[in-house]
Structure formats: C-alpha cells, structure tokens
C-alpha cells in the first residue's frame, strides 16, 4: 500500500471511527462537513484512499465505503544513496521503492529510504548496503541520527547544533567528527529505522 498524506490519514481515521460508532460509513457530505471541506474536496480524499487501497466503495451508493484490512507493510520511495563516511554527491532520483513494516512509521509525515555507502555508522549498527528509513524533517533534537547536506554532499551522522556550529559525529571510533558552520548544513531527514537485505 502507498503511504498516506497527513490529511488522508485523518480522513481514514474519521471514516474508521464513524463506522465503529454508527455501524455504517459516512457519506461524502459527512466527511466534507467534519473537515470543513467542499464535497468535491472530500471526494478527492476518498478517491485517493480508494486508489491507495485503504478503502473500497460503490460510487452509486452514498454510504458504501468499506475499510480494507491494513497490510503489515507499506512502500516508500528509495531516493538514492547516502554516505556513512565523508559525504557523497547529492543523491540522484531513483525510481525504486522498498517495503517496510507499517509499525516503523506512524502514518503521518513523509518517509523515504536511502541506501548506505560506507562504515562511519557501524557502532550504531548501520552498515554498508543497509537502507535507512528517514522521516522528512528539517529540524531535529541534538543527539539524533540524521541525513544532512553540506558542501552539496549528503551524509548520515549523529547531529549536534552548538551556537553557530554543527558537529556531525560518526558512530565509528576510528573516525573524527565533521564540524561546519550551521548556515552551511541542512537537515533533510531523521532516522526512524534500518532495513538490511541479506
């Protein structure tokens, strides 16, 4: 199944709750009223949920939405490679997806995967060839592992922001931290999981 946007997840949660409380599905007008949308706007979200495989419905019946049993996995895009080292050129767009356990993500947000190249994160059990699952976000707390861009290169490191500097710390005791000006560093995602394919 495809990942949901925040609004699609909210609409799906509303449909689920409505069915549990009433024993039948909401109409497009019920959904529109709840979210303060036009009927057309609500219809677009329902069509997206149907296309992504979360619901089925009969367009000829206004209360015909049925929930599809949620799968144990979801597909997210693989955006390219990320260095677990000194950094590699910005990742290229790759037309690839990877299946991950649904429990790895909370349904909200934008998730993507990158394939790891290098050994700078081995003490965090992230090795060359692993896929790191990242939640797209631009700010993270100190001490979190993040995908960051600096000098037009992307790398995976533990992130520390101190005043006007950023310290990118490897999880490999044989390697040194990278220290850069904060203005030259951009966080692109927070690590939420690792997939290893044998």
Curated annotation (Swiss-Prot):
Under catalytic activity, the entry for this protein gives:
Hydrolysis of Ala-|-Gly bond in repressor LexA
Q: Which CDD domains match?
A: S24_LexA-like (cd06529)
| Gene Ontology terms describing biological process | DNA repair; DNA replication; negative regulation of DNA-templated transcription; proteolysis; SOS response
- Gene3D superfamilies given for it? Umud Fragment, subunit A (2.10.109.10), Winged helix-like DNA-binding domain superfamily/Winged helix DNA-binding domain (1.10.10.10)
Q: Which UniProt keywords apply?
A: Autocatalytic cleavage, DNA damage, DNA repair, DNA replication, DNA-binding, Hydrolase, Repressor, SOS response, Transcription, Transcription regulation
What GO molecular function terms would the record report? DNA binding; serine-type endopeptidase activity
Sorted alphabetically, which InterPro entries does this protein's record hold?
LexA, LexA-like, LexA/Signal_pep-like_sf, LexA_DNA-bd_dom, LexA_repressor, Peptidase_S24_LexA, Peptidase_S24_S26A/B/C, WH-like_DNA-bd_sf
The residues annotated as the active site are 120 (for autocatalytic cleavage activity), 157 (for autocatalytic cleavage activity)
Give the EC number(s) under which this enzyme is classified: 3.4.21.88
Ranges annotated as DNA-binding: 28-47
Site (Cleavage): residue numbering on this chain: 84-85
Give the protein's biological function. Represses a number of genes involved in the response to DNA damage (SOS response), including recA and lexA. In the presence of single-stranded DNA, RecA interacts with LexA causing an autocatalytic cleavage which disrupts the DNA-binding part of LexA, leading to derepression of the SOS regulon and eventually DNA repair.
Under the subunit heading, UniProt states: Homodimer.
Q: Say which family it is in.
A: Belongs to the peptidase S24 family.
What is the name listed in the Swiss-Prot or TrEMBL entry for this protein? LexA repressor
Q: Which organism is it from?
A: Thermosipho africanus (strain TCF52B)
What gene name does this entry carry? lexA
